[in-house]
């Protein structure tokens, strides 16, 4: 697909402006294709933790999440007991929601069951976009959907596999963040740079 015309004014996606942490995340991470199983698992857990809150809240707490959730290693999280859950729910450095903490543990167990047969988590997730990022051509934030048929399919498959906090809207936000779709506006320099540097088909 064509890039924005050379005369088109270029500026970052409006949602990242006015908050330094958002801007750094937008410029360095959001929309960059992720293929690493552990990184994808981490992102899925954090997207679920964000439900009903702002992503800024999660970004502010992400480093602490990584510390108390053992680097988001599924094998470790799957073994969490009630004492660990109680410690997490008493920790102001994370989002203290019992259902979300329980979902992280359940999702770790579902991750292990899903990958036990040899399929990678990455391959399982990327199948919903045919293994390659979808490069969209949005000109305004208003045009970007909250969910798509691809996120609907991912959500249904994850739920069948036992995952929690994986509704279609959460899955689409996950797909945007993990680079399964390039939803930077065409007026954003990252739209073309991600395409160039990560070899979209």
Task: Please identify what each model-predicted range represents.
Residues 1-201:
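HhH-family (HhH-GPD) DNA N-glycosylase catalytic core used in base-excision repair
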């Amino acid at each position: 697909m064509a890039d924005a015309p050379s005369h088109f004014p270029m500026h970052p996606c409006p949602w990242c402006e006015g908050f330094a942490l958002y801007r750094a995340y937008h410029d360095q991470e959001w929309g960059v294709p992720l293929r690493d199983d552990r990184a994808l698992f981490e992102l899925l857990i954090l997207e679920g933790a964000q439900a009903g809150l702002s992503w800024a809240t999660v970004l502010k707490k992400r480093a602490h999440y990584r510390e108390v959730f053992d680097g988001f290693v599924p094998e470790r999280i799957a073994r969490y007991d009630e004492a660990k859950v109680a410690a997490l729910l008493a920790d102001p450095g994370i989002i203290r929601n019992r259902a979300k903490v329980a979902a992280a543990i359940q999702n770790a167990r579902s991750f292990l069951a899903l990958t036990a047969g040899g399929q990678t988590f990455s391959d399982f997730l990327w199948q919903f976009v045919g293994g390659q990022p979808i490069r969209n051509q949005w000109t305004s934030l208003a045009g970007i959907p909250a969910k798509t048929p691809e996120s609907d399919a991912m959500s249904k498959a994850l739920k069948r596999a036992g995952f929690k906090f994986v509704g279609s809207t959460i899955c689409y936000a996950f797909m945007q963040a993990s680079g399964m779709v390039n939803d930077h506006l065409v007026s954003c320099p990252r739209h073309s740079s991600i395409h160039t540097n990560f070899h979209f088909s």
